[in-house]
């Protein structure tokens, strides 16, 4: 029985997938804390789909897919900020416009050059078959993002919480927003290998949303989100070995189950908890 439980650890590709997924899940969860604070979960969705044309172009020209995805994500983020700054459109309308435009462009490129683009890898990810070069790319992305987040997390928190106060202490909201979107785009690129473009949104939203239901303190929220993101990613890869199913699907399913548990039973914000308190107060 023990040999069966330890079997996944005997394969190098499984060990690589577990370690990489854990790191990606943790860093994406860290960013998801800020998305919850600002109410920007839709931006995470937009960026996760906006990288598709960059990936498609990179595949078509035999370039590193991470390069194309990163620049597409940055372009999408800057487009959102720019259009919002020069128009009266609401943020959700701008995000929806950019998201649909970039995703449609990606599908168009794929349809025009289908043999050059591995659509399945873009949509579903391929963490179990990831090449060593891609592992190094993802490791560098995660390392740089982690260092920058640890250096600037307090500044980002102030920018997201109160831009007016941030300006009074000499911080530039525009600079830190660009920095955040750059980090988010980079992490989306890393997560593409794990769960694919369609499910990336779950990794940059669900851990933060779950933690948001459990605490009102940002530092605690971030810690809970990171733990949830890392653990579900590790366990998801492990379970997928026995299920012989899509790794990304298993990871996101686990994260969704934990969210539902928090949604129902959170001590302060859980649906059943609030209903119980309402009945007791009658």
Language model features: what each stretch is:
Residues 198-249:
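Transmembrane alpha-helical segments in multi-pass inner-membrane proteins
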Residues 245-282:
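Cytosolic-side transmembrane-helix boundaries in multi-pass membrane proteins
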Residues 50-60, 97-109, 129-130, 173-178, ...:
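Small-residue-rich segments of transmembrane alpha-helices in multi-pass membrane proteins
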Residues 2-16, 87, 91-154, 282:
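Transmembrane helix-bundle core of multi-pass membrane transporters
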Residues 33-115, 212-223, 242-243:
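Short loop segments and helix-boundary regions at transmembrane helix junctions
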Residues 147-180:
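Membrane-helix/interface signature in polytopic inner-membrane proteins
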Residues 17-20, 66-72, 92, 96, ...:
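Loop-to-transmembrane alpha-helix initiation sites
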Residues 13-25, 63-75, 139-143, 189-203:
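Structural signature of hydrophobic alpha-helical transmembrane segments
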């Amino acid at each position: 029985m023990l040999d069966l439980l330890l079997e996944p650890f005997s394969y190098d590709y499984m060990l690589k997938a577990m370690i990489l997924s854990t790191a990606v899940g943790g860093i994406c969860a860290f960013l998801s804390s800020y998305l919850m604070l600002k109410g920007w979960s839709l931006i995470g969705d937009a960026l996760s789909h906006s990288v598709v044309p960059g990936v498609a172009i990179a595949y078509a020209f035999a370039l590193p897919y991470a390069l194309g995805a990163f620049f597409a994500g940055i372009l999408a983020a800057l487009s959102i900020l720019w259009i919002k700054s020069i128009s009266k459109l609401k943020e959700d309308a701008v995000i929806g416009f950019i998201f649909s435009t970039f995703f449609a462009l990606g599908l168009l490129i794929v349809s025009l050059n289908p043999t050059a683009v591995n659509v399945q890898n873009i949509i579903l990810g391929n963490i179990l078959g990831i090449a060593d070069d891609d592992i190094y790319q993802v490791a560098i992305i995660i390392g740089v993002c982690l260092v920058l987040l640890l250096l600037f997390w307090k500044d980002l928190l102030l920018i997201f919480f109160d831009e007016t106060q941030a300006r009074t202490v000499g911080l530039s909201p525009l600079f830190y927003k660009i920095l955040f979107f750059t980090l988010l785009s980079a992490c989306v690129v890393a997560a593409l290998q794990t769960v694919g473009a369609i499910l990336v949104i779950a990794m940059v939203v669900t851990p933060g949303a779950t933690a948001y239901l459990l605490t009102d303190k940002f530092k605690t929220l971030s810690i809970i989100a990171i733990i949830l993101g890392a653990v579900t990613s590790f366990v998801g890869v492990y379970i997928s070995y026995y299920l012989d199913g899509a790794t990304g699907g298993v990871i996101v399913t686990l994260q969704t189950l934990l969210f539902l548990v928090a949604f129902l039973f959170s001590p302060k914000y859980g649906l059943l908890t609030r209903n119980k308190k309402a009945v007791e107060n009658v």
